[in-house]
């Protein structure tokens, strides 16, 4: 089975939209959900220190392959995991393990795609994703607590080195090119990978993006639930099977309940919730953060200089650097 390309993310670089385009285009056969068992194995085996490089790689397609279709593998879980724990060293090992598993497909393709974006806007999106997955806290707290993890996510120098061990045609393309000139983006992708250019553009959103008051309420609810679980988990008066089961079940379902609530609650219901939480308004700095010079220097070494060297797009990288400089000067 010949593969047109393997798309590994980065996370929060319009991967869901791209997968939607590929899924709806008649010329493309997509494996996205079909890769979820692979991603789950990578996460569990990496965390448990039992990764087997010789494990058979079974990939399912999201829909049956039709004659003449080109196969695309796309899952951002191949480049990022452990957002909940923020374990940078575990992520580094995970990325290596993922590249080893994908490397077994080198006889079926030499094409790997990594999409990237401005680090400042990416951090904002990662903070929102962290809240969507059950986390809590401001953007500034998120950056402070997960600095090493975020740098590892953006370590393009490391990722490119991993995949170039197995694949000859590893390419990087910017998120901004897709957002600012979609037709040209798909045409460029078709040219560099010799694959069909999709014509689908009207892709329904799989999950609504949250912002402002809704995102803040989500953070508060997640934080409250986490506090309650922690108290019960360490309680000396409430012990036994019921306690263990309750903590486990609530951890699994609570983030979904909170997420769906803030998606579907009316404005009045959100205001009422804020009142119960004794938080009448969203703090002005909830979604703002500043970047240290040290953090910016690391991004320059691992990310910006790599993008500039590989793409030659000095104008785009200059834009990224300007945004970083602004984030050093004042909260963004």
Q: What spans do the regions from the language model cover?
A:
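Anion-recognition interface
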Residues: 1-332
């Amino acid at each position: 089975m010949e593969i047109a390309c393997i798309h590994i993310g980065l996370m929060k670089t319009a991967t869901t939209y791209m997968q939607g385009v590929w899924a709806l285009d008649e010329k493309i056969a997509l494996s996205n959900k079909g890769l979820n068992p692979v991603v789950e194995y990578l996460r569990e085996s990496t965390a448990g220190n039992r990764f087997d490089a010789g494990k058979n790689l079974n990939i399912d397609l999201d829909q049956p392959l039709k004659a003449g279709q080109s196969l695309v593998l796309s899952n951002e879980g191949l480049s990022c995991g452990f957002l909940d724990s923020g374990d940078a060293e575990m992520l580094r090992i995970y990325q290596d393990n993922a590249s080893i598993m994908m490397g077994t497909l080198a006889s079926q393709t030499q094409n790997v795609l990594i999409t990237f974006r401005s680090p400042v806007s990416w951090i904002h999106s990662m903070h929102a994703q962290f809240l969507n997955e059950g986390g809590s806290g401001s953007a500034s707290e998120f950056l402070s607590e997960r600095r090493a993890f975020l740098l590892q996510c953006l370590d393009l120098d490391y990722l490119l080195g991993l995949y170039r061990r197995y694949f000859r045609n590893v390419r990087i393309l910017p998120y901004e090119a897709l957002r600012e000139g979609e037709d040209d983006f798909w045409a460029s992708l078709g040219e560099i990978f010799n694959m069909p250019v999709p014509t689908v553009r009207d892709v329904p959103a799989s999950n609504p993006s949250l912002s402002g008051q809704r995102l803040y309420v989500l953070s508060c609810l997640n934080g409250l639930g986490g506090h309650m679980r922690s108290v019960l988990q360490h309680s000396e008066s409430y012990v036994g099977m019921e306690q263990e089961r309750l903590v486990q079940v609530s951890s699994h379902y609570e983030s979904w309940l909170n997420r769906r609530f803030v998606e579907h609650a009316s404005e009045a219901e959100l205001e009422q919730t804020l009142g119960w939480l004794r938080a009448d308004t969203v703090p002005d700095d909830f979604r703002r953060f500043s970047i240290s010079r040290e953090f910016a220097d690391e991004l320059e070494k691992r990310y910006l200089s790599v993008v500039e060297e590989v793409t030659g797009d000095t104008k785009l990288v200059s834009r990224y650097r300007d945004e970083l400089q602004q984030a050093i000067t004042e909260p963004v």
